[in-house]
């Protein structure tokens, strides 16, 4: 499984990339591999506010429908429509195919997420 060094990871197999007070959020290589071929992705609208642990969206595959849990508090400021229109992008490029961008409410929450090495160890358990 591919794990990128410059991202933060949740136990729900969601990655977070921080740029200033903005965070891009997507699913990990492990998550997309477990789900199988994504067929449909339901994403929130711009302006939607979330608290860490809320369901951000749903990814449906032939195997299952899986909730995507947001690991930080924030307001959606951008939605990746390309992924909504072509869900297979999360399979072919899970780290390049972010789902949403949020304005972070508390950057300290990101520091509580796993860094790459911790996430790799988590995957081994």
Swiss-Prot record:
Keywords: Lipoyl. Belongs to the GcvH family. PROSITE patterns: BIOTINYL_LIPOYL, LIPOYL. This is Glycine cleavage system H protein 1. InterPro entries: 2-oxoA_DH_lipoyl-BS (IPR003016), Biotin_lipoyl (IPR000089), GCV_H (IPR002930), GCV_H/Fam206 (IPR033753), GCV_H_sub (IPR017453), Single_hybrid_motif (IPR011053). GO terms for biological process: glycine decarboxylation via glycine cleavage system. The modification N6-lipoyllysine is found at residue 63. The glycine cleavage system is composed of four proteins: P, T, L and H. The glycine cleavage system catalyzes the degradation of glycine. The H protein shuttles the methylamine group of glycine from the P protein to the T protein. NCBIfam families: gcvH, PRK01202.1. Its cofactor is (R)-lipoate. Binds 1 lipoyl cofactor covalently. Coiled coil: none annotated. It comes from Caldanaerobacter subterraneus subsp. tengcongensis (strain DSM 15242 / JCM 11007 / NBRC 100824 / MB4) (Thermoanaerobacter tengcongensis). Residues 22-103 form the Lipoyl-binding domain. One of its GO terms (cellular component) is glycine cleavage complex.
């Amino acid at each position: 499984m591919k794990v990128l060094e410059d991202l933060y990871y949740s136990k729900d197999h969601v990655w977070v990339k921080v740029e200033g007070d903005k965070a891009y959020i997507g699913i990990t290589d492990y998550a997309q591999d477990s789900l199988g071929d994504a067929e449909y992705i339901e994403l929130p609208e711009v302006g939607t506010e979330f608290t860490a642990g809320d369901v951000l969206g749903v990814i449906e595959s032939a195997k299952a429908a899986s909730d995507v849990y947001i690991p930080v508090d924030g307001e959606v400021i951008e939605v990746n429509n390309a992924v909504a229109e072509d869900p297979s992008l999360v399979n072919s490029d899970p780290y390049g195919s972010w789902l949403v961008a949020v304005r972070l409410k508390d950057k300290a929450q990101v520091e509580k997420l796993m860094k790459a090495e911790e996430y790799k160890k988590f995957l081994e358990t």
